[in-house]
């Protein structure tokens, strides 16, 4: 019999995009107001406002992928450095490094974006 995980994995990409689609917001270090909109078609819009740099604003658009079911990889076309978030639950994601490491427990709350 086919394992439930394999069946789920086969379906996961489309489901995951629908599941994570939405707009997330938070203030990330160091004082960067961050709004990330993930669309069900696999595109994203990331807006960052740098409070410490006279509210300088940066907008990035691109495509994202689901890796391992709960890691979002945002392809960053201009710098070539991808941005990674991990899905924590239905309403929040957390910024992680390219190795999949989450921030340590003491300051992880500073790296969370919550669904708006």
Question: Which residues does each predicted region cover?
Answer:
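Lipid interaction determinants
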Residues: 1-59, 73-116
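Short, conserved beta-turn/loop elements at beta-strand boundaries and strand-helix junctions
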Residues: 68-71
């Amino acid at each position: 019999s086919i394992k439930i995980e394999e069946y789920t994995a086969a379906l996961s990409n489309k489901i995951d995009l629908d599941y994570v689609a939405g707009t997330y917001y938070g203030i990330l270090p160091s004082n960067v107001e961050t709004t990330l909109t993930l669309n069900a078609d696999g595109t994203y819009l990331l807006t960052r406002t740098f409070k410490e740099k006279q509210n300088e604003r940066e907008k990035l658009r691109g495509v994202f992928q689901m890796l391992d079911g709960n890691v979002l990889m945002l392809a960053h076309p201009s710098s070539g450095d991808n941005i990674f978030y991990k899905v924590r639950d239905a309403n929040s994601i957390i910024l992680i490094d390219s190795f999949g490491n989450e921030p340590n427990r003491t300051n992880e709350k500073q790296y969370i974006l919550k669904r708006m």
